[in-house]
UniProtKB/Swiss-Prot annotation:
Top-level class of the enzyme under EC nomenclature: isomerase
Residues binding substrate, per UniProt: Y109
Keyword Secreted: no
One Pfam short name: PseudoU_synth_1
Name of the protein: tRNA pseudouridine synthase A
UniProt entry keywords in alphabetical sequence: Isomerase, tRNA processing
Reactions listed under catalytic activity: uridine(38/39/40) in tRNA = pseudouridine(38/39/40) in tRNA
Recorded family membership: Belongs to the tRNA pseudouridine synthase TruA family.
Main function: Formation of pseudouridine at positions 38, 39 and 40 in the anticodon stem and loop of transfer RNAs.
Organism field: Methanothermobacter thermautotrophicus (strain ATCC 29096 / DSM 1053 / JCM 10044 / NBRC 100330 / Delta H) (Methanobacterium thermoautotrophicum)
GO molecular function: RNA binding; tRNA pseudouridine(38-40) synthase activity
EC numbers for this chain: 5.4.99.12
Segment forming the signal sequence: none
Length: 275
């Protein structure tokens, strides 16, 4: 019996999060169907199937992990053939029994914003510095979370083309925590908060409501573990997933162009014919 780890990528748009839920499609549910269909596992409990990251509905991933025990050989293409196109196993590894997929040393999330001229990335970076270290993130989570203390290793903000990239690194995260952190940074950029106000939202009993940013812009980029994992990457899986992403990018770009044309036309009508 071997312990196996799979590195999984997915587009979260069509799923109600990663974790299994009754009567709705989830990434974990589709993955288990494929593993059972391929004869790799028969029962998740007997296989001691575990997941690393429970991403929310609409959140995407390029490096989530699962682990399980099996006596069967692993053929990535066999698993991927039974998965929807928007879920891919990118790599696998045989790991030691003590390996615990649920406890990575670091999780890397990336949130992508469309850059507006009014956005002040310098103030955002100044505010983001307050997140580093160990803090009580109660204002960035649900009130029902029993232990809101988390450690953030780093927050990096960069501009790439028309995008602002916010990379957040930490051991673990609360529900909606990253999306609420980004909301606070955006409020700083828009002048609703000062950079130093961020300190007042941390380690405090004063409760402030922060609307989480949309999940569709969030990606779980990767997980790092304390033990070295010899991942066997599948080149064909990479090519197929890249191809799908490029197809979807083209579709969304064309949809954006159509909406822009409609908006421009209505503005023209408003200016010249609705006097």
């Amino acid at each position: 019996m071997r312990k196996i780890a799979l590195k999984v990528a997915y587009i979260g748009t069509n799923y109600h999060g990663f974790q299994r839920q009754p009567d709705v499609p989830t990434v974990e549910g589709k993955l288990l169907e494929a593993l059972e269909g391929a004869g790799i596992i028969e029962d998740p409990k007997r296989a001691r199937f575990q997941i690393a990251g429970r991403t929310d509905r609409g959140v995407h991933a390029l490096g989530n992990f699962v682990s399980f025990f099996t006596e069967e050989d692993i053929h990535v293409n066999q698993i991927n053939d039974l998965l929807p196109r928007d879920i891919r196993v990118l790599a696998w590894a045989s790991v030691m029994y003590p390996f615990k997929v649920r406890y990575p040393l670091e999780r890397h999330y990336r949130y992508i914003l469309h850059r507006e001229e009014s956005m002040d990335t310098y103030s955002m970076a100044e505010a983001a510095a307050h997140f580093r270290g160990t803090h009580d993130f109660s204002n960035f989570s649900r009130r029902s979370d029993r232990d809101p203390v988390r450690r953030i290793n780093d927050v990096r903000i960069s501009e790439v083309g028309d995008s602002i990239i916010i990379d957040v690194y930490g051991e673990s995260f609360l529900w909606q925590m990253v999306r609420k952190m980004v909301r606070a940074l955006l409020m700083v950029s828009e002048g609703e908060l000062a950079p130093d106000d961020m300190a007042g939202l941390l380690d405090t009993d004063r409760r402030v409501f922060l609307e989480p940013m949309p999940p569709e812009n969030l990606i779980l980029m990767d997980l790092k573990y304390g033990v070295k994992i010899k991942l066997r990457h599948d080149e064909y899986a990479f090519k197929r997933f890249i191809s799908l992403l490029e197809e979807e990018f083209k579709v969304y770009r064309e949809m954006s162009m159509v909406r822009r044309a409609m908006s421009d036309h209505l503005r023209d009508l408003q200016e010249h014919e609705l006097d």
